Amino acid sequence: MAYKLKQSGDYRKRRNFSMIKNSLELDNLLQIQKESYQWFAQEGIKEVFDELGHIESFSGNLTLELGDYEFDTPRYSIKECKDRQITYASPLKVQTRLFNNETGEVKEQEIFLGDMPLMTESGTFIINGAERVIVSQLVRSPSVYYSKELDKNGKPVFASKVIPTRGTWLEYETDAKDVIYVRIDRTRKVPMTTLLRAFGLSSDEDILNMFDNDKFLKNTIEKDSTKNTDEALIEIYEKLRPGEPTTLDSSKNQLITRFFDNFRYDLAKVGRYKFNRRLNITDRLLNMTLAQDIVVDGETVFTDGTKITKEVLEELKKYLEAGYGKEEVKINEELDTHNVVQVLYVYSPLDPKKKVKIMGNDQDIDVRTLTISDVYASVSYYLNLLEGIGHDDEIDHLGNRRIRQVGELLQNQLKIGISRMERVVRER
């Protein structure tokens, strides 16, 4: 029988007896592992140092920076490591700079940070003389997810989860009395309006103006015991840390640490991409009917009542991407500075005479922490779902999953190690 010789990897050739040509080339799985580790060694470590390698003392007098790094030659070969039952690794040396912020003095020194295990040509690691492999993980992508269930009366009930790569989760839910609650890091729930007050919408009027007098938020306000931003901050602190003494400063610092601190909260690049894609107002516009004129440079390009088909949406995207509908909104600037959202009005599918406000986040944001713009947009999407606008997610769909390869897994472990080192350095 006729066959063709086909290269498989760097060293082997395989006989292929297939009569039909494969439409897809098989990936070199070994090369994927090796390229991922190479990315970690060349770029992943640098990203961690750029993100976390700026350590300041509690007094603010001294600042330590982690700069360039290099790998020294491994002490032993792969065979020697197996024979001696030790780890095949290379010393990682880092150039550090210590700044004295009072005198302006700068000291530079190369330090030994640790032994970094090296990947062999086979895509494995030698750990204590034994050959080991890091298995890629299939995980849920960081994003904003919305789910729908039917209660015992057949009424749709929505829930939402705001999930980062690392950090505190937010979960939205609605009870039988149409009151919206939020759970912060899966703890006891608080009314949604309490969180909105903490993020800058201090009064009832601020909340209702922002979300267009939404009836669900009106119900929630009635259950909310707080009346302004300061009370909301303290209420959230007491829910998350019951029994601890409460001050306004500690309440603010807690929210900053949980959501707006690079050390504690990280969306990663994929998370920011998914957040911006999900919270973009274009995700909710298809098959809706415009409830406003779209006027650009004094010219009406779309009129009130226009049905948003695929063709209309593609044209509308051009104006939205150019900044149409962007507004600055009220936020708690002590927590965050991102105060831009994008707004458009459509008619409700459930009540064709009712105008509904669609609010998206700032698509120009490229930070890896949560922003108040993200929170407002995620709440708006949740309220839109209750009006029949938008769509829920199938959480187990592979489109909502991603693969964490060896390079990213190692980078995450390095982040944990640098964060621990940062605490020790500050204390000393």
Where are these regions (language model features)?
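N-terminal non-catalytic structural scaffold regions of very large proteins
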Residues: 1-428
